[in-house]
Amino acid sequence: MTKLDTLIQELCPDGVIYKPILDVADVLYGYPCQAKLFNSEANGMPLARIRDVLAGTTTTYTTENVPAMYNLQYGDLLVGMDGNFHVGNWKMNTGVLCQRVCKFCSKDEEYVILNSYLSHLLPPVMKRVEESKQSGTVKHLLAKDISTIKVPVPPIGVQREIVRILDNFTELTAELTAELTARKKQYEFYRNELLSFTMKSEW
């Protein structure tokens, strides 16, 4: 029996409770920023738009005086609201939440739900919401869609163990990806060298 199995058996023997996501997390919808104030010269505040959600970084800035409530900090959990409902963590030290991107934040991280648990939980949840939308048009995530979402909320101890397991897996995956990328470059180098030698020998 794994540590997770033991925790589940001890802390939630009757199963995990599902709660409306708005009962455990606050959602902030992005500010309608003015495009005419955007720039790529790092002038002003970094701007988190839909295209930036997965990467968690941006090259677009705004000089607009956006209310402070829309300011972002490192690690904030973002969801894109058009097209693909991507989920990602903001990786810059500051930023501004732009319209059609929303931010999720635990109402009570100490006793109810961890932000790190939400980070792992939301991608499959949003994928299901996205797939439930009619195809053939650009899909839009609406506030009413979010209000219908229910999520499993195990005890904090169980959440911490789930996060630990998934974080370790993510780290291993990143290491394997880096290794595969390096091997691919190595293969391409030797392939090009060998093909170059073959071509020379034919002359």
Specify the residue positions occupied by each region the protein language model found:
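Short, solvent-exposed loop/turn positions at domain surfaces
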Residues: 10, 65-66, 90, 135
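Amphipathic alpha-helical segments
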Residues: 1-2, 13-17, 114, 147-184, ...
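DNA target-recognition patches
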Residues: 22-25, 34-63
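A short beta-sheet element
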Residues: 49, 68-123
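Accessory (non-catalytic) regions of SAM-dependent nucleic-acid methyltransferases
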Residues: 1-11, 202
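Non-catalytic DNA-recognition/assembly elements of restriction-modification systems
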Residues: 8-31
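Basic, amphipathic alpha-helical recognition segments used for DNA target recognition
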Residues: 20-28, 94, 102-152
